[in-house]
Amino acid sequence: MDSMLARAGAAMRDGNGTTPVSEVATAAHATVRTLERKFKQSSGFTVKDVSGLIRFEQVRNQLWHTPEANLAGLAYELGYTDQAHLSREFKRYSGTTPAAFARNAKKRKHAVSNDFVAFVQA
């Protein structure tokens, strides 16, 4: 892998997807234009797209493990402008709303725990 892309990826992960593109470029020892071009060539995505995916995965993981999490609190914690911004981005990447995903996660967790109890009792 290109060391510039590796440094950029590390900076984006370290910043949980909230690091501005200009700071990612600085960490990668590149200009913004060069970094954007390399990202697009290697992955087909922009730096901003990848940052958005990093944040989306954090929201998804939080909601999977804690379906009752407060969306406004998550939005603030993960650097979204507001809850509506979080919801739009979540739907963009997953095709569903964060609230619907959380409800589904809660149902699945309940089903898994019931299956486990039935397995242990058998």
Please give the residue ranges for each predicted region:
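DNA-binding recognition helix and immediately preceding turn/loop
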Residues: S3-D49, P67-L78
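…primarily DNA-binding HTH/wHTH and HhH modules…
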Residues: W64, E89-A122
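Generic alpha-helical hydrophobic packing signal
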Residues: S22-A25, A30, Q58, Q62, ...
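Residue-level detector of family-conserved "landmark" positions at structurally sensitive sites
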Residues: V50, H85, F101-R103
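Short hydrophobic clusters on alpha-helical segments that form packing/core surfaces
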Residues: A8, M12, F39, S43, ...
